[in-house]
Amino acid sequence: MIKLQFQRNIVPTHDNPLTTSEILKRLRDLLGELTSLSQDTIDRDSVLPVARSLVNNNLLHHKDKGIRSYTLCCIVELLRLCAPDAPFTLSQLEDIFQVILKILSGLMNQESTYYPQIYEILESLSNVKSAVLIVDLPNAEEFLVNIFRLFFDLARKGTTKNVEFYMLDIINQLINEINTIPAAALNILFAQLISGKGVRQTIGSSDSTNHGPAFQLARNIFHDSADRLQRYVCQYFSDIIFDSRDSLSDSMTTPEFIFSHNLVLQLWKYAPTTLLNIIPQFENELQAEQTSVRLVAIETVGLMLQDNAIWSDYPRVWSAFCGRLNDKSVACRIKCIEVASNALQNSLATSEIIENVVQMLQSKLADTDEKVRVATLKTIEQLTFETFKMQFSVQALKLMGDRLRDRKLNVRLQAIRTLSQIYNRAYQDLIDGVEYSIQMFSWIPSSLLEVFYVNDETTNAAVEICMAELVLQYLSSDTQTRLNRLFLSIKYFSEKAMRVFILLLQRQVKYSELLNYYIECCKNYNGGVMDNDEESITNKLKKVIDIISSKSSNPTLTEATFRKFAELNDRQSYKMLLQTFSIKSEYQVVLKSIKYLFKRVSETLSTASLECFRIFVYRSALFAFNKSNVHEIIQLLNEPVKYHNFLKPSEALLQHLPLIHPNIYGEVVIEVENIIVSSGIESDPKVIKALSQFSKRKKNFSIQTTTAEILRKLCLHGTQEQAKQAATIIAITETKEFKLDMITNIVENLEYNGGLPVRLMTLGQLFLYTLEEVEKVADQVTEFLVKKVIQRFPEKYDDTHNDEEWCTYEKLDNLTMCKVLAIRVLVNRLRAAAGGTEALNIGAPIIKLLKVLLMADGELSPFKNTPKISRAYLRLTASKYFLKLCSIPFYAEHIDFSSYVQISLLCQDENFDVRNLFLTKLQKQLQLKKLPISYYPLLFLTAVDPEEEIKTKASIWIRSQVAFFQKTHDFTMEYVATYLIHLLSHHPDISSIESENSLDFIAYIRFYVDTVVNSENVPIVFHLMQRIKQSYDVIEDGNNYIYVLSDMAQKILQVKSQNFGWSLTTYPKQIKLPYEILRPIPSIDEKKRIFNKIFITPKMESQIEHAIRTPVSSFAKQTTNKHANLKQKKTHSSKSDKKSSRRRKNEKRRKLNEQNPNIRNVPERSSSRFQGIRINYSEAPSSSEEISEEEEEISEEDFDEIEDL
């Protein structure tokens, strides 16, 4: 017999401490010797001392995993050598197997340092069969349960085949040796047969094909130990339904419970009478306290809805199921939604049941949890179109439309997909003119496009894909179907949606140019093989890829995708991509190229990269405007009676074609002229406008004589819109003699009558585009406009419509309409004459007229009898043309500061529509970079607007600008703070800032801070506010209000930074303030005195702290309540309120007149103490040199308002 030679101490003690490394070394030596010994030759007594040492707590429960692993390896070797009698007591074996179970969990991580030792432990337990020692332990059943649980956990998470084999062998050994298999172990075992992954995979999927390793392990156990398990399986099926519920928890059900419900489903389908005493118990399960129980019951009953009629056979169970739609658990609500629609597939379902289910789905579209909303949308998407038509209402579908603007991205994406699918199914009804379907579904494309205002790139991309593939079906080879879908959608577009659609078409040109340049770079790059200029070519390719990536929601993926495409150097793919956006391509060529391109690149690009590539191809492809479509549009316009349903959409598309693709329009311009000639005086303004747009973009363009004669008639006797477009075409294309003849005809017949507005519209265009010919009669026209129109007043005061605040332009009385158009003619003369020698002499009285209109509230009549609507329109017109002149640097230099203040107060006009329309115009001009930076502060005056719509509109736009400038690292919006403080210091209410109006000025500044300032730019803004206190006001010397506002802004920034944890670090750079309004204080002592002085009162500080800590909505009420004189959208003030408002305004005017007696006799409505002071704001970007009517054109930059929000 061979004795164990190892005699060294392996147990650390207080007297004989051992380091961890020393213990590991000795254990390795011991393990090596034990492994080399044979069971037949070992002297059993020689290993007993080592056995006693190995079960010492200092080794078996050592904190080091390596020591525990090697200790257990030694122990299992001892079990091998001493088998069948273990050299350990039962208590020691119990401790050993507890540690073994813990250490075996390490089999999940094959990268573990001690994985080989753990593997050896498992292997020895299997081969030596030492695991059967567990059955002799007092708590053998508990050990068996833990082993089942551990091994199946390991199997689910993935192990090697050898590990699975050893685990199978060990479990089989235990099953065959133990006296009684515990129920808990059987529960674990049965659960694996179902799938072991949760209710969704288990209920109703007893023969699932998705069998993982855990299932395989369980199946093999049943196969190898079938005789032993047979009795337990029978007993389980007999007792499970009645005995298992007491062991259920709120978060987890037992596998037996799940399996029993699968059994119920099978019996319900094939033998429902066997469940007469079981199904009623589902009522209790559906209302059980445990969430897990309710989940299983909900899914079980939901799946049962597919067969038979549970609502009639078991009405109480059906009622309990419907009640789970409002379950407190999100998971239960989702499950109920997902399975409730099964009732709609059951032929036994009555109309009452179907209606009930539909109402259940509708109600969950507004659930408080996003997961529930997503689940509802997915479920609805799966319903048939007939179900929608028969059971859903327009209001229910509009609730789905509301989810397009959901705060959560996942909900928006699912709503986009669902609504697109619904519209696609409804198309045939819509094209057939089914009225009910039109009411139900026609709004969907419009709502989808309006999603662009959510300002999320991922959402935008989803809309574009769904519009292209489902709504408009751009990939359809049938031109007529494709156009019908396009016209049908446009027919029901809202104004917002139409604007987005046109901007998307406009953006297509940008993307096609970008991809065209990208392809050129790819060709030069030649897959990385270049002979010359390698660095330059590579840099160009990198730059264009960076630009493309910046327009994606996933720049990293986009960069990798287009880099991969370039490296492939597939010349055929380059050709196909070019053909998708070539204006020479027929649509069939475009379609064929797209399909071929996608098929070709799918072989090399991943699925994610292909999706990324697809969206850019869709954005650049000529889907809407291509040669095939344009010829079809012209054909449609030639037969208006036949195609009357799609006449307006086709006209709308044709109107924008010359703006976006003038070359394509040029091929059909003769056909457009023929349409105008054939229609005569009834010509559609949109068709004429399209020709007008083309004439402004096409050099040396001329029209046919017959077309010119028709346009001439329209200039004299058409509608205003017809005259406007016709006059533009004539001014650009016709001969000097033709234009002079028409001008003479108009001027000789100028008189105030019902036809004057049309002639004034014509004159306005002629002054703008052909000033040289009109200038000879300009003074005569101006005299007529001033004396016979502008100075023409109502004969008597008409109080009939005294309460009316607004009306559309078309409903204006003739006199007001003529005055508006007269102002337009005068301003257009100035716009055309900009830079000329006489421009200032001509412009001075016109600019003065605009200013007087603003100061006088639009009232020019000495009898004060101008109707409210007329005054409102005149104020709006004056402000609108002031902005036009400010966008021209030549005139901007000569518009004084007091006029600027007057313009700013339009944001606080008493009329809601004036404020709203002026704000829209202001935003557009700023968006196009046509106004100086000093006009940004006007937007923040909406902070105290009583109408939430105005404030929201301004807030959204400001935030979009902030986001845009941050992308380009532009500090424009931060610099605006200086202009805002300066403007507020000249606000008419500034004199009462220390009393009743302090909250207003806090609101202005807080509005700026809330919309512009963040943790990154707060140091810059704070620095600017401090710099203001080192400067003096150029406009009004001694203006200390600017310092009060500076301190107020600093305090607001400090309080907000403290509340939000922002760091107010010192800004390291020195920023120059705008020199035209603020200049450094020359005296050092004076500068120091002002800088150190606190200009705000303790009361103001308290108000600021309270304001910042108060929700915006609550604080807004405190400010807007004081502005009740501002007319809200749908609210009319009482007569007493109006009188009070007039008194306040008159008092304000009196005070301002006292400050500047030079203008006392001039009618005004706000501060004028800065009259005559001119400020040069020409450093800001201004309009292009080309003269154009902004309302006629859509600039390419317009898309930034949506794309860069």
Curated annotation (Swiss-Prot):
Listed CDD domains: PDS5
Chief localisation class: nucleus
Protein name according to UniProt: Sister chromatid cohesion protein pds5
Pfam families on file: PDS5
Purpose: Required for the establishment and maintenance of sister chromatid cohesion during S phase. Prevents their formation until eso1 is present. May also have a role during meiosis.
Any one GO biological process: attachment of meiotic spindle microtubules to meiosis II kinetochore
GO MF terms held by the record: chromatin-protein adaptor activity; DNA binding
Region (Disordered): 1111-1205
Organism: Schizosaccharomyces pombe (strain 972 / ATCC 24843)
Intracellular or extracellular location(s): Nucleus; Chromosome, Centromere
UniProt feature, compositional bias: Acidic residues: 1186-1205
GO cellular component, one term: mating-type region heterochromatin
InterPro entries per UniProt: ARM-like (IPR011989), ARM-type_fold (IPR016024), Pds5 (IPR039776)
Zinc among keywords: no
Gene3D superfamilies the record matches: Leucine-rich Repeat Variant
Residue ranges, compositional bias (Polar residues): 1111-1123
